[in-house]
């Protein structure tokens, strides 16, 4: 395997592993009063890392992350989804958190976000601006005094830009 390969079996296998981990762990994490914000699975020095980002109303503590890590680790050991060595990390999504669900966008209306689209608007795929509105199927954001409506179905990824949202 070349070092640049995303995983044994390629990027599709990484996506499949992420989906399986999400499906396996979401009910248990939800039962703990938390939600999964994002799951990453990638090769880093010295090996593979599985990161599960969780959040709850009021934020998550180090103790919360340790508890969820034990639960997720036990589930993954039993399910045997990943067949080679990896390191599990459970943490808060941080200030510049990813945005995936409509509800997550609704919480940050008026803040600065970044969106990368799957299909370009003209020649543009990257947008950074103030989130103005969240609809059922799309968001509206102001990028340098120009309004863009971006459907959720065209979003590759989106992220809150916490420090860009703070006033001087």
Curated annotation (Swiss-Prot):
Localisation = Cytoplasm
Q: What is its main location?
A: cytoplasm
**Any one of the GO BP annotations:** ribosomal small subunit assembly
Spell out the GO cellular component terms annotated for this protein, sorted alphabetically and separated by semicolons: cytosol
CDD domains reported in the protein's UniProt record: YlxS_C
Summarizing the function annotation, the protein's role is: Required for maturation of 30S ribosomal subunits.
The record's PANTHER family line, in alphabetical order, gives: RIBOSOME MATURATION FACTOR RIMP
Quote the protein name from its UniProt record. Ribosome maturation factor RimP
């Amino acid at each position: 395997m070349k070092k640049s390969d995303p995983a044994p079996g390629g990027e599709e296998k990484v996506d499949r592993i992420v989906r399986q981990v999400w499906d396996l762990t979401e009910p248990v994490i939800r039962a703990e009063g938390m939600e999964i914000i994002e799951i990453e699975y990638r090769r880093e020095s010295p090996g593979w890392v599985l990161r599960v980002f969780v959040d709850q109303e009021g934020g998550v503590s180090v103790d919360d992350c340790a508890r969820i890590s034990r639960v997720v680790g036990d589930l993954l050991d039993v399910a045997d989804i990943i067949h080679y060595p990896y390191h599990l990390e459970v943490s808060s999504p941080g200030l510049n958190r990813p945005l995936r669900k409509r509800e997550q966008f609704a919480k940050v209306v008026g803040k600065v976000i970044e969106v990368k689209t799957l299909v370009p608007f003209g020649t543009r795929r990257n947008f950074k601006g103030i989130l103005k509105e969240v609809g059922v199927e799309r968001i509206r954001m102001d990028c340098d005094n120009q309004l863009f409506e971006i459907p959720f179905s065209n979003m590759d990824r989106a992220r809150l830009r916490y420090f860009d949202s703070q006033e001087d």
